Each structure stands twice: as C-alpha cells, then as structure tokens.
C-alpha cells in the first residue's frame, strides 16, 4: 500500500472509483493525467504498457493504496529507496513524514519527469537502484 495516505480514505476511494467500475476506461484517463509532464517520445510506450495490465492486477494495485497500515503501525527498519517526481502536490514535510516511518530511507525527488520516471529515464533510475543496492550491501 501507500506509505502514507494522500487524502482521507473516503476521498481516495472516490478518486479510484472510476478505475474500480471500468478499469480500462478509467485507467486511460488516469494514466493520461500522470503523463502530462512526460517525455513525448515515451508517452505511447508508457500508456500502452499500463493499459496492457490485466484489470485484476490494476485494480488490486489501486486497492493496496487504500491500506495505510504503514502510517499507523510502526516503522520499516530496512533500507528503503524512494524516487519520486517533483510535484507541488506533495506536502512540504513529506520527506520528514516518510523518514519517520522508514528511518533508513534514501529520499530522492527528480525534476523534469512524471509519475513514470523509471520509464522516462531508465538508465538514470537503474543506476540509482544499483548504487542503493551496492551501498546497502543488499546483494
């Protein structure tokens, strides 16, 4: 689920309601909204990849975002890498709120990318993951 809820539960449920009713129809609009800042050359790939997801998988992923158990039940005491697109929507204290739950978190915000930063800048993303794994001796 989400590390922290991004809105009260009833608002999150309402936000995802179109996806629960008609995943493919709702997902197209949802994805397009997240692609507004996206690099034009990868937009079709991202959109087609996301829409190829089976309905039950997409719906399950959305439902897990309703689970706020991390926010309400203790800490994650393992190394965590958070890579997020810079967005004025995020609360100003998000880094502090996240690291309170996961004290070993490495928190990165990236400019010039959308929600799909791993698909827009795969080499840079993979390098950050590789460095994180190496630094934390996870392999």
Regions found by a protein language model. Name each.
Residues 1:
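Alpha/beta-hydrolase-fold catalytic nucleophile elbow
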Residues 4-10, 18-75:
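Conserved alpha/beta-hydrolase catalytic His-Asp/Glu region
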Residues 5-11, 93-96, 120-121:
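Short aromatic-enriched loop/helix-cap "lid" or pocket-rim segments at secondary-structure transitions
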Residues 15, 77-80:
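N-proximal accessory regions
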Residues 59, 92, 127:
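Alpha-helical elements of the RecA-like P-loop NTPase motor core of helicases
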Residues 79-114, 119:
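Conserved loop-alpha-helix segment in the C-terminal half of the alpha/beta-hydrolase fold
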Residues 105-139:
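Catalytic active-site module of serine/aspartate enzymes centered on a nucleophile-bearing elbow/loop
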């Amino acid at each position: 689920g989400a590390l922290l809820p991004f809105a009260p539960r009833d608002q999150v449920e309402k936000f995802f309601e179109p996806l629960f009713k008609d995943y493919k129809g709702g997902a197209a609009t949802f994805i397009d909204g997240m692609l507004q800042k996206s690099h034009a050359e990868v937009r079709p790939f991202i959109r087609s990849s996301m829409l190829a997801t089976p309905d039950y998988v997409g719906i399950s992923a959305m439902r897990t975002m309703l689970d706020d158990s991390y926010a309400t039940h203790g800490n994650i005491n393992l190394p965590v890498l958070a890579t997020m697109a810079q967005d004025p929507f995020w609360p100003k204290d998000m880094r502090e709120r996240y690291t309170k739950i996961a004290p070993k978190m490495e928190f990165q915000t990236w400019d010039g990318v959308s929600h799909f930063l791993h698909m827009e800048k795969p080499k840079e993303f993979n390098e950050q993951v590789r460095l994180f794994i190496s630094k934390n001796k996870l392999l």
